[in-house]
Amino acid sequence: MARRAHMDCYALGDSSQFSKTVSEYDVYGFAGIVGDMYGVHLDEEYAKGTQFGKRIAQGALSVGFLATVMGHMAAKAPSPGAVSYRYDVTFKAPVFLGDTVTARLVLAEKEEDRNTCIFDASVTNQDGVLVAQGKTYLKVL
């Protein structure tokens, strides 16, 4: 694959982030969209009996926040742009309703021959607790 000149608009260490307070509306809305109706997310009584002691957000919601940040990074590339195509994420701690999380990406590696940017990805809560961590991949078109 030929190297795209648009790769030059990305530099190692480039970063972006997105913060959001997770609400009941977010958890119910996400459940309705993706069909994740598991009790630990939607049923307070059920959740009280779990190791978490209260309701938690779906893990994939944290991946969605990372996708928002990937959109910020993709927007840096001039037309025809860039797209995210891979998320390797591990969930480290629960996100509770009312938590304010920050999804952050830092450009860690550029694979020029594949027109790919690889980002270190993290999601932390308001106390600095790491709730999700991994890598995300952006293809420059």
Q: Where do the PLM segments sit?
A:
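HotDog/MaoC-like acyl-thioester-processing domains
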Residues: 1-14, 91-141
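A solvent-exposed, acidic/Ser-Thr-rich amphipathic alpha-helical stretch
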Residues: 60-61
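Catalytic strand-loop segment that frames the active site of acyl-thioester-processing enzymes
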Residues: 1-57, 141
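A generic structural signal for short beta-strands and their flanking turns/coil linkers
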Residues: 12-14, 18, 26, 36, ...
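Hydrophobic beta-strand-centered segment that forms part of the acyl-chain substrate-binding groove
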Residues: 50-54, 64-104
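Amphipathic, positively biased hydrophobic alpha-helical segments used for protein targeting
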Residues: 24, 42-46, 64, 70, ...
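Short, intrinsically disordered, mixed-charge
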Residues: 32-36, 71-75, 126
